């Protein structure tokens, strides 16, 4: 069968590998239908993902159809449509005991630490698979995992109905955060450098948008919130300067949610954090967000609405990665098909 593998930086190959088989009673064999290309996949391709090990079959935004199940599998049967939860964990470390396996001491992420889903068939434990409606188009189902990232950020920021939320960055993850924040009942302002992205954010529910090259973000936030500041700031740009801006723009008693892995230091003093008693929290992957997202997808309350802009056959995967590399402003989300 075909599998898309990054062997080293910029060395992407479509390899012929053996089709996996069930070896444990709790395992499920899935025929892959769609795989989204995430920013982290591009970082693996570029050799700049600090967490990935190579060579690696990439892909963690995966949907497909169950082909076979192990003897002890109860929740799934052949023919079911599923989405993939890409994390495995030990279940016994401090993070797992606290109900946060997404930061398990022995965390393994599908497509990052272990071979992922950009191949024709995969085998995973039942607990990493969630059934979705067979009426749900594959291009909608493949967005489940990115939506869980948005749901996690909104949960970590404790976003509630009536809150004002500033989301920095109107890229794919920023839009996923936007969708989940609006479903939570928040008013949302979004920032970006790109007017087309900001227009798309407005189409998807943003109440206000700011081009950071044309306007002063913190001043606009104060105007928008009646001088209060944003109750929650979610940084999906993930640069030292946007982290610092988050602290400036957040309201007293507010939350700042950080999604990035930038190792550079930000210039932030203690004073605004303590004076405003700001809660700063990281948000990584997701914890128990799949059931909520699946329910929203099945009910038609979550739709990509233009977020998926490009689809490529697995036979054209090299062209897909080259196109994203050369035309990043044209691509919101690209999806690889395995039909």
Curated annotation (Swiss-Prot):
Where Zn(2+) 1 binds, per the record, is at 38, 60, 145
Q: Name one Pfam family in it.
A: ADH_N
List the molecular function annotations (GO) for this entry: oxidoreductase activity; zinc ion binding
* The keyword Metal-binding belongs to this UniProt entry's keyword annotation: yes
- What's the cofactor? Zn(2+)
SMART domains xref list:
PKS_ER
On whether Oxidoreductase is a keyword of this UniProt record, the answer is: yes
User: InterPro entries annotated for this entry?
Assistant: ADH-like_C, ADH-like_N, ADH_Zn_CS, GroES-like_sf, NAD(P)-bd_dom_sf, PKS_ER, Zn_alcohol_dh
Q: Which residues bind Zn(2+) 2?
A: 90, 93, 96, 104
Give UniProt keywords alphabetically: Metal-binding, Oxidoreductase, Zinc
Q: What inducers act on this gene?
A: Induced by galacturonate, repressed by glucose.
Any other noteworthy remark?
A: Member of the exu locus which is required for galacturonate utilization.
Instruction: Name the family.
Output: Belongs to the zinc-containing alcohol dehydrogenase family.
Q: What name appears for this protein in its UniProt entry?
A: Uncharacterized zinc-type alcohol dehydrogenase-like protein YjmD
Gene that encodes it? yjmD
């Amino acid at each position: 069968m075909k599998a898309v593998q990054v062997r080293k930086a910029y060395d992407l190959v479509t390899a012929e590998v053996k089709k996996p088989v069930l070896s444990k009673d709790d395992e499920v064999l899935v025929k892959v239908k769609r795989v989204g290309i995430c920013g982290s996949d591009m970082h693996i391709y570029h050799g700049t993902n600090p967490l990935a090990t190579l060579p690696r079959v990439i892909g963690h935004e995966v949907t497909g159809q169950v082909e076979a199940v192990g003897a002890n599998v109860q929740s799934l049967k052949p023919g079911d449509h599923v989405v993939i939860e890409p994390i495995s964990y030990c279940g016994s470390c401090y993070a797992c005991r606290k109900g946060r396996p997404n930061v398990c001491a022995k965390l393994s992420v599908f497509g990052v630490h272990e071979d992922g889903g950009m191949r024709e068939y995969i085998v995973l434990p039942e607990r990493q698979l969630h059934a979705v409606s067979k009426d749900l188009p594959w291009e909608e189902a493949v967005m489940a995992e990115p939506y869980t990232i948005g749901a996690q950020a909104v949960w970590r920021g404790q976003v509630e109905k009536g809150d004002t939320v500033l989301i920095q960055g109107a890229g794919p993850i920023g839009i996923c955060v936007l969708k989940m924040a609006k479903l939570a009942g928040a008013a949302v302002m979004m920032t970006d450098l790109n007017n087309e992205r900001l227009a798309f954010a407005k189409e998807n529910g943003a109440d206000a948008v700011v081009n950071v090259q044309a306007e002063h973000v913190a001043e606009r936030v104060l105007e928008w919130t009646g001088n209060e500041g944003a109750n929650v700031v979610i940084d999906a740009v993930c640069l030292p300067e946007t982290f610092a801006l988050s602290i400036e723009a957040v309201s007293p008693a507010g939350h700042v949610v950080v999604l990035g892995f930038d190792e550079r230091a930000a210039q932030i003093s203690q004073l605004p954090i303590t004076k405003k008693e700001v809660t700063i929290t990281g948000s990584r992957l997701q914890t128990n967000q799949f059931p909520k997202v699946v329910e929203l997808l099945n009910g038609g309350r979550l739709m990509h609405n233009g977020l998926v802009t490009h689809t490529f056959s697995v036979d054209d995967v090299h062209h897909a990665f080259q196109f994203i590399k050369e035309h990043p402003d044209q691509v919101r989300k690209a999806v690889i098909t395995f039909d």
